Amino acid sequence: LPGERIGYLVIPDEVDDFENVICAANVANRILGFVNAPSLMQLAVSKCLDATTDVAAYDANRKLLYNALTEYGFECAKPEGAFYLWVKAKEDDKAFVAKGKEFHILMVPGSAFMCPGYVRIAYCVDHAMIERSLPAFKKLAECYQ
């Protein structure tokens, strides 16, 4: 369930102020609205605990996209477990995203993730879409050469 925030809070026995920790977690959840997983998602994830995922498709997409982008001259952080790629923007990340749109490339500015100067590109799509996108990435790279 990529993107879902599922987890739990463990409070060691050594914590003397157990109730304050619970209160702080509850306040954070009410204020921020996304700290603790909603009950519905907790129930849904319990049905998925024994499920497996074939990560070979993600790996093939990762390799294809990473290899092509680095060949075109982009500097990328090679993912080791994510379904997205961080690419160093050739200019301000928001301007770079706007330039990518001219070639129908959808990227997210890294500043949205407190990582300015980079863009995030998801590769959890059909392999054919990655293949079809490569000429556009090549044209984008040529704009900065």
Annotate the PLM regions.
Residues L1-Q145:
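PLP-dependent class I/II
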